[in-house]
């Protein structure tokens, strides 16, 4: 058997090949020496996680409530919602064809809307649809399992239980949702809370009710009937579920006295990201296979996320496929055989011009995210069109000002699978009864926050229809 070998002398042969191309690529007064590392010093700081204080409301299913952002820390880096999901038992008196489970992406869908306000003016917002899109295109595979555990995609919550079975565990299950507000994107855009003593800062939540999140099915109901059943307290479950302890945690940076003094001394403009969600519109491929939707966004749009949501079951919030999930015993198949993307191709029109003409869904689900997003979704039905070279990058890398455009339309042409499933003729479980859909589109835009004289004020009004520039 021969032994592997090499020697240092052979490396000098490589060094001797230096020529014109190498002169262009290597050397010069600004060249980097990879073997003498320079230390990039930072200012002195530490970081500490703390729970935020409740301000208004009751943190419960179906309620609106808020927490106050403390100014005790210098910079707000990240925030996350921590919720205890209670155990729920399906009545043992029911037939064995019944099963109960929580909806997929439970922590996403618990949030009807979350906002951050400065003196009651909304600076940023997001909803469950943005949470679905954002995580699908930004959470890498190496973190996906951990993220799923945080948001409730665990077997003890989303796998169906038979009569007498219990979802969750005694004492409840603690779930965590990272809140993707603009200040959490990078430490360079952290919210300088210590420089804002005259602003009342709040994070506000609107929670969905439990019956919008729990799913009861009865397999004895066969097509053309749907297997979904409305839950009745006292018949199917003994009592309405009640959330356990709910907290909002914040990670703060504490800086030196010198840096703290400088925070309020100069005007500072911060480039931030905001989310706009267009009103959802019914998508009926049986009667109109190529509907035209008018979308009205504003500001510098860097990315568009869109999908057709399958709303056959109102509580299946995160289903963007042609078929409904299929329950078999103690398991559920969220993408059963015969489940496809409801959209075949999409046309984007503005200024009476086809910006994109009948682009196939493979472009929006595979090609565009391959080049312009951190990751490609592993789920059916997610679509991205990025104006930015890399939409996850904080630096401006491409956008279009939708406030300057007129007559913006999106035309998502239905796939043959969507047409068949809408008529209940899909031929496979999950699409063998009539499916119903709605069109969802979300935009991410850039905007500017100005901090001056210890205040954040608005030059133009922030609104749900379009966030405006917030300056002081």
Swiss-Prot record:
GO CC annotations on file: viral capsid
Protein name (Swiss-Prot/TrEMBL): Major capsid protein
Localization, UniProt: Virion
Family indicated by similarity: Belongs to the NCLDV major capsid protein family.
Keywords: Capsid protein, Late protein, Virion
InterPro entries in alphabetical order: Capsid_N, MCP_C, MCP_C_sf, VP_dsDNA_II
Protein's job: Major capsid protein that self assembles to form an icosahedral capsid. Represents around 50% of the total virion protein mass.
Chief site of localization: virion
Parts forming coiled coils: none
Organism: Simulium iridescent virus (IIV-22)
Gene3D superfamilies membership: Adenovirus Type 2 Hexon, domain 4, Major capsid protein Vp54
Posttranslational mods: The N-terminus is blocked.
Gene that specifies this protein: MCP
GO molecular function: structural molecule activity
Quaternary context: Homotrimer.
